[in-house]
Every structure is written in C-alpha cells, then in structure tokens.
Amino acid sequence: MQQFAVFGHPIKHSQSPRIHRLFAQQTGIALSYEAMLAPLDDFPAFAMAFFQQGGRGANVTTPFKEQAWQMADVLTPRARLAGAVNTLHWQNARLLGDNTDGVGLVSDLHRLAMIGDASRVLLLGAGGAARGVILPLLEQGCRIALANRTHARAQALAAAFQAQGAIEALPYDALGTHTFDLIINATASGLQGELPPLPRSIIRPDCACYDMFYRAGATPFLAWVQQQGAVRLADGFGMLVAQAAHAFSLWHGIMPQIAPVLIQLRQEPVG
C-alpha cells in the first residue's frame, strides 16, 4: 500500500487525512495517509526519513513550507515563484516540490463565482500564504492590490511578481479611494481576532470577501465584513479540499471530484 502523509506542527487539527481517504474511496486507490507531527528543529531529516522508508508523497503545512521548498530537488514553476512548497512527491530517488495552494484557491473562487476576468482583487497580507496564491490569480487576469501592516513587505512582494501581471502595493490608509471586486484575507493573525485596519467604505454588497483560513463558525475577518454589509463571503475550507485534490492528482494521475467530498465534510464538525 502506498504511503502518504501531511507534515506540520501542530498537526492534530488537520483535515488532510480525512480528505485524502475520501478521495481514495472515490477513485478506488488503496493508500495510507497519516498526519505526522514534525519536529521544529530538524524538519528536513524527518521528512527524508519518511521518504527513505517508503513514503511516496506528503503535504506540508505550517511552519515548514519554506523548508520544504529549500529541500526539493526539483521545483514546479509555480512553486519556484511562490517560494514555498505544500506538496512533495518522491520520484526516482528525487524530491519534487509543488505548490497547489494558489490553484486550490482559484478553483474554489470559480466554484463560488467570486472571480472573473480582470477582477480587481485586494489581497491582505504579504507572508507565505499570500505569496503562494499571487501567480494563479495573475494568470486569471486579476489585477491585484497588496496591503500589509508593514508596507515595505507588500512593496517587495509586489515587485517580485511585477513581470507576471498587474500588481501593486497599497498602504491601508490609501484603500478608501479604491473599489474592489474581491477581498482575500491571507493573514493567519485573523484567527486570533486581530483584524487588518481596513476602511469600512471598501466593504460593499457587490464585493465578495474570502478568508483563506477556516474554523468552526465564522472567522473574525468574515464576521467583521458581514457586520459592514458584505453578503458574498466564504472561508478557506473549499480551498483546502481543492488544493488537496490537485496534490492527489499529482501523486496518482487522476483528478478526484471535489464537490462530493466538500459536501460530506461540511456536514462533519470542523476542528
């Protein structure tokens, strides 16, 4: 039986084993998929031991995505630009690194009809979560504005993708003069209740709001935008299932159906 895993710290909350087992049932593929608590001080050795002992592939979550990027022998173009890897594939004694976060996000945005050609997108945050989704958004023709508490970080990130499409960095206090079709929160600090200093005026009924993170009930970001009048909003659970589907496809050569798994998981408690 092929062995797969997800590496993280913490990891007990991960939905990935459940998702991949449902994909396996759907496609008739026999596999083992486990959540593995990786040590903070020696992730590369831990990961390589898994592959040398027969592991075929692994998902990588916080805080190891940058280390996974560094240890990959081969990177896909989207992973190279993202500077982070969330999917590892052991092939012919070489480690391939990919990043399916961005394509997972775009897939979910299409499912929700939140994105279109030339959508004006405000992306909140300039860390790894934001960086991993910029290229797929630009490839959709989106025009991206980056906002971050440390404006210099947003400027540096925008500069890194300048050749790939329309992207700029805007300070929070300048956002009030702009209108957006979609606002995406890519700041994990929101889960602790820390909200970005957004001007209320940019939250309009026709502006969709998406939080890349999820938890049981509304995230603080989604609760806040709803209070400001937003009516089209979604959390990142659909993105999680979609990025997992693309990782599954990389490993097994077959794209599973996302919708049935998402429906089933939505009926189960979210950790």
From Swiss-Prot:
Binding site residues for NADP(+): 125-129, 148-153, 212, 236
Q: Which residues bind shikimate?
A: 14-16, 61, 86, 101, 214
State the UniProt keywords alphabetically. Answer: Amino-acid biosynthesis, Aromatic amino acid biosynthesis, NADP, Oxidoreductase
Pathway of this protein?
Metabolic intermediate biosynthesis; chorismate biosynthesis; chorismate from D-erythrose 4-phosphate and phosphoenolpyruvate: step 4/7
Entry annotation: catalytic residues:
65
Question: Which reaction is recorded as catalysed by this protein?
Answer: shikimate + NADP(+) = 3-dehydroshikimate + NADPH + H(+)
> So what EC number does this one have?
1.1.1.25
Q: Does the keyword Ubl conjugation apply?
A: no
GO function term, MF aspect, one = shikimate 3-dehydrogenase (NADP+) activity
| Enzyme class, broadest EC rank | oxidoreductase
Would you tell me the Gene Ontology cellular component terms?
A: cytosol
**Family stated for the protein in its record:** Belongs to the shikimate dehydrogenase family.
UniProt-recorded name of the protein: Shikimate dehydrogenase (NADP(+))
| Protein's organism | Edwardsiella ictaluri (strain 93-146)
